């Protein structure tokens, strides 16, 4: 499509990390903003779809103490910054995530937030609520699954999720439901 892409992340200096970096290079995605940490292993997440196209996950991780030690790419107006998952909530990475989102807002980039909140973190939902709200405040677009919001808020009704949890912070909301519908909510559409 001719659009320049930057990927900000981290990986270990191991076979998994090398596969990831080579895949990125093979697909013309620069690796300049991927922190390759020398101690620790590349995290691996495996997703298995059930008969309803809902994913079940297994996570393997062994992180070093120093994380996300990268320089951010140049960000310009109307660039799209995608943040999400526990990565955007992790207290260890929070300062770097906030730095990125502050730059994005200052430069008038579009922040797209996908909570991707998994069942493995549902017991932390209350503790993570202030960070989730902060991400919603930075977001120009929020996109999540019914499953995400169920684990975050215990709610499965799209309209209630939008009105009670999203709209105040971000007026543009997309909600998926596995193989079912995709719902769009805005100030003008409900």
Sequence positions of predicted segments:
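Residue-level signal for inorganic ion chemistry
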Residues: 81, 114, 141-145
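Conserved phosphate/ATP/ADP-binding segment of small-molecule kinases
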Residues: 107, 121-190
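Anion (oxyanion) recognition and catalysis
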Residues: 25, 102-106, 136
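Conserved N-terminal subdomain of the carbohydrate kinase-like
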Residues: 4-85
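Short beta-strand/loop segments at the ligand-binding rim of alpha/beta enzyme cores
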Residues: 108-115
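Hydrophobic/aromatic residues located in beta-strands of well-ordered beta-sheets
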Residues: 5-7, 111, 173
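Active-site beta-loop-alpha junctions enriched in small/polar residues
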Residues: 62, 86, 116-120, 147, ...
């Amino acid at each position: 499509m001719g659009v320049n892409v930057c990927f900000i992340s981290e990986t270990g200096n191991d076979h998994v990390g090398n596969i990831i970096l080579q895949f990125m290079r093979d697909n013309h995605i620069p690796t300049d903003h991927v922190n390759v940490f020398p101690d620790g292993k590349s995290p691996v997440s495996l997703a298995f779809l059930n008969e309803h196209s809902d994913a079940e996950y297994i996570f393997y991780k062994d992180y070093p103490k120093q994380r996300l030690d990268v320089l951010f790419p140049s960000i310009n107006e109307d660039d799209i910054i995608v943040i999400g998952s526990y990565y955007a909530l992790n207290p260890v990475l929070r300062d770097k995530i906030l730095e990125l989102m502050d730059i994005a807002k200052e430069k008038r980039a579009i922040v797209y937030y996908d909570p991707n909140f998994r069942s493995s973190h549902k017991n932390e939902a209350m503790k993570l609520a202030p960070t989730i709200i902060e991400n919603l405040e930075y977001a120009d677009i929020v996109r999540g699954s019914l499953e995400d919001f169920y684990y975050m808020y215990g709610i499965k009704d799209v309209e209630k999720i939008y009105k009670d949890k999203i709209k105040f912070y971000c007026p543009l909301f997309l909600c998926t439901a596995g193989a079912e519908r995709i719902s769009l909510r805005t100030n003008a559409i409900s």
